[in-house]
């Protein structure tokens, strides 16, 4: 009957913001146009929060800016480097999904920030604090410049190959092709070079310019055209990954039917509906806002929130969620959350935040990129200069080889594949009702080989009922049930609720409880009419030195039946005994079997007695069960598994079992829908109470890890091959672009496969 709160791991345990001290903020609908930027940057996996100074000054304030051109780590790196040099800027927070930049600064105005961003070729629009974010305007580019570029590049190649016209004609056609398709790349490349940033735009601009200078006009045109096409396809693919989560938000209707003061019903925009308003929903309609049913009954498809395949019965007092579908009957509900603070909105916001946290593979890519790109650039310079100067080689041949090296100098495939794969995995999990709070958990789930589980509400339904009552003191026979009910009514533990509920029909006179105190892992204590009473488990009785062999025998008999026993005591001894039983969820048996098939061992940790723990564990097939545990005992059990070399996950309700959940590699919270605490604090929040979602998560984690490894291997092999054939003088520039961008698209599409899981 503990009432502990779920506090979480320190930030040092994982490379992301693990304190979760912030509250989830409202979310707005958003959509992305095909912003044609390549995401090649050494800092693609950087966290969204960048601290430029150790502490913020007393006068620091937060200014938010919408930057429509900022939807890729390429722009993030440029902005970070530029604003990092601006005196007074202390912290940057990038939201690439919504294209919003938060700047913590102590500048007198935001003009220097806006000017600095403008110098990078981007426009920063200041946003009012708390204002709703406007959706990014889809960027509509005319198709004819790209078509002209492609036709020009092809014609230049054909004329050059057949000698059908003079070289100056080829040069003119190629120049038209380059200018029509590559001006944007040149502009971005120049800005990057001015800021000493070797991103893909800078490298491609240098390579194309070099090809022009040595007279390779047709190849320069073809390289620029292929790069522009690949970049466009890549941007569309990235948008698909970004919009996978945002698409959920479109499930909420724009309007809902609201009861007016005169009793009439009027359609109103959901954003304008106030808390407490009475909303009507007919069969087949989507529910527009979170609320509580006040009239009617129906079945509701909750798949957008919980991933449940079967509709759920709803009646008066039940919660309903925005975005879910009313199926059979009419309902009226009272609004409990604003449109931008619904459970669905908070889920989407949490996943968007999770996209900024670095997974282990992203950290590897980050480190690799910082070394690889400058190294290949220096190698290209050496290749262009050393053989002609010191080995008598032909300048043209080796400059050309150096230009080919520049094309493969940016690890685009590596850089792009990791975030696309992680975002796709996060979206796939969210659609199944599994809220993963970062790539570090999505990728780390495949390592788990041991899962510790709480009992009540996790393996069992968490809705126990009182099955037995036994008076232990004839003098208190009349008063004991009422006293127990009064104490139990002050606790929110399921066992206490069962005792309190059983007393409702008996209509006891209400008793006032003074000096009430919850005793973690043992029970509760309170004063009634000046007398101190305890209501608790076997451990509490022993602590009070009020146990006896006769009482032990009674407890043992009930515990062997899988029942939890609670005793009412005063200073003289036990007054009454209450036995409570919970039922095992059928889904728990299936989940444990699936975990067994995945090679994951299971351990049940519960504050309930050992006999009940073993009985429940035997029913569902759990490998090992430990009972009579305090929260600190559960922590020690997790530590013991770590000491044996296991990677451990812990499943609880997101509120109790705080130390164990915090210590585990991944903390899973059950039934998080409608529970703010669980959504905010869990590493992985299951939106309903179906334990089968954990093996589903582990399978998804293994698939994600496999795809990440496939992508890294493919990208590195292609890079190695092209470095080899470049030195052999076989590779051409357009072949390098085709291969480099081709493998980038392959790994992106491979990552997007997770959206179909």
Question: Language-model features: where?
Answer:
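Bilayer-spanning, highly hydrophobic alpha-helical transmembrane segments
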Residues: 143-154, 363-392, 401, 405-411, ...
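Conserved cytosolic catalytic loops of P-type ATPases
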Residues: 87-105, 110, 247-341, 439-484, ...
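ATP-driven catalytic headpiece of P-type ATPases
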Residues: 159-160, 324, 449-492, 522-603, ...
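Flexible metal-binding regulatory segments at protein termini and peripheral loops
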Residues: 1-168, 244, 262-267, 274, ...
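Membrane-embedded alpha-helical bundles of multi-pass transporters
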Residues: 158-166, 186-189, 194, 206, ...
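Conserved catalytic phosphorylation-site environment of P-type ATPases
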Residues: 201-205, 254, 305, 364, ...
């Amino acid at each position: 009957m503990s009432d502990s709160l779920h506090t979480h791991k320190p930030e040092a345990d994982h490379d992301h913001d693990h304190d979760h001290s912030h509250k989830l903020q409202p979310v707005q609908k958003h959509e992305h146009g095909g912003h044609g930027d390549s995401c090649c940057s050494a800092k693609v996996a950087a966290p969204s929060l960048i601290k430029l100074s150790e502490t913020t000054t007393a006068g620091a304030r937060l200014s938010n800016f919408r930057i429509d051109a900022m939807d890729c780590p390429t722009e993030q790196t440029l902005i970070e480097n530029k604003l990092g040099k601006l005196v007074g800027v202390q912290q940057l927070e990038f939201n690439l999904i919504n294209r919003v930049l938060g700047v913590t600064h102590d500048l007198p105005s935001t003009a220097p920030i806006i000017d600095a961003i403008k110098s990078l070729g981007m426009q920063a629009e200041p946003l009012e604090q708390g204002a709703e974010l406007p959706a990014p305007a889809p960027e509509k580019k005319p198709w004819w410049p790209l078509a002209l570029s492609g036709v020009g590049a092809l014609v230049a190649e054909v004329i050059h190959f057949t000698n059908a016209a003079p070289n100056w004609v080829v040069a003119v056609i190629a120049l038209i092709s380059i200018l029509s398709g590559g001006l944007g790349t040149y502009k971005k490349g120049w800005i990057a070079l001015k800021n000493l940033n070797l991103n893909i735009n800078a490298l491609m601009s240098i390579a194309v310019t070099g090809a022009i200078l040595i007279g390779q006009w047709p190849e320069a045109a073809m390289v620029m055209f292929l790069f522009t096409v690949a970049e466009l396809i890549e941007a569309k693919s990235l948008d698909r990954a970004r919009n996978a989560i945002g698409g959920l938000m479109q499930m909420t209707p724009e309007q809902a039917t609201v009861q007016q003061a005169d009793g009439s019903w009027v359609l109103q925009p959901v954003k304008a509906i106030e808390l407490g308003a009475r909303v009507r929903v007919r069969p087949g309609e989507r529910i527009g806002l979170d609320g509580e049913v006040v009239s009617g009954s129906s079945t509701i498809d909750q798949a957008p929130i919980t991933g449940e395949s079967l509709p759920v019965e709803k009646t008066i007092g039940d919660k309903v969620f925005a975005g879910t579908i009313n199926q059979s009957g009419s309902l009226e509900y009272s609004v409990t959350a604003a449109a931008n603070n619904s459970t669905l909105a908070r889920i989407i916001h949490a996943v968007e935040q999770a996209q900024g946290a670095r997974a282990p593979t992203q950290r590897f890519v980050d480190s690799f990129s910082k070394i690889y790109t400058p190294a290949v650039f220096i190698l290209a310079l050496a290749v262009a200069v050393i053989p002609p100067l010191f080995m008598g080689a032909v300048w043209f041949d080796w400059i050309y080889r150096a230009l080919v090296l520049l094309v493969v100098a940016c690890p685009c495939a590596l850089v792009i594949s990791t975030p696309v794969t992680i975002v796709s995995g996060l979206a796939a999990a969210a659609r199944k009702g599994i809220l993963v709070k970062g790539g570090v958990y999505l990728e780390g789930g495949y390592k788990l080989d041991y899962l510790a589980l709480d009992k009540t509400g996790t393996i069992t339904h968490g809705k126990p009922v009182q099955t037995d009552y036994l008076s232990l003191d004839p003098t208190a026979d009349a008063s004991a049930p009422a006293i127990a009910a009064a104490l139990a009514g002050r606790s929110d533990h399921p066992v206490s609720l069962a005792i309190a509920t059983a007393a409702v029909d008996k209509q006891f006179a209400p008793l006032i409880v003074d000096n009430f105190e919850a005793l973690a892992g043992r029970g509760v204590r309170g004063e009634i009419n000046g007398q101190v009473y305890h209501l608790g488990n076997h451990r509490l009785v022993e602590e009070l030195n009020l146990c006896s062999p006769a009482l032990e025998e009674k407890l043992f008999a009930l515990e062997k039946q899988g029942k939890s026993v609670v005793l009412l005591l005063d200073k003289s001894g036990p007054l009454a005994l209450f036995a409570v039983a919970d039922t095992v969820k059928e889904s728990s048996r299936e989940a444990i079997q699936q975990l067994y098939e995945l090679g994951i061992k299971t351990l049940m940790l519960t504050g309930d007695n050992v006999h009940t723990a073993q009985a429940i564990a035997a029913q569902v097939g759990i490998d090992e069960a430990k009972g009579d545990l305090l929260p600190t005992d559960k922590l020690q059990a997790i530590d013991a598994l770590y000491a044996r070399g296991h990677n451990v996950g812990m499943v609880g309700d997101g509120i109790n079992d705080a130390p164990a959940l915090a210590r585990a590699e991944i903390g899973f919270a059950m039934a998080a829908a409608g529970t703010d605490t669980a959504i905010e604090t869990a590493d992985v929040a299951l939106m309903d109470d179906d334990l089968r979602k954990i093996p589903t998560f582990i399978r998804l984690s293994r698939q994600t890890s496999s795809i990440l490894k496939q992508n890294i291997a493919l990208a590195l092999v292609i890079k190695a091959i092209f470095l080899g054939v470049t030195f052999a003088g076989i590779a051409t520039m357009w072949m390098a672009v085709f291969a480099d961008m081709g493998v980038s698209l392959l790994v992106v599409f491979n990552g997007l496969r997770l959206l179909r899981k």
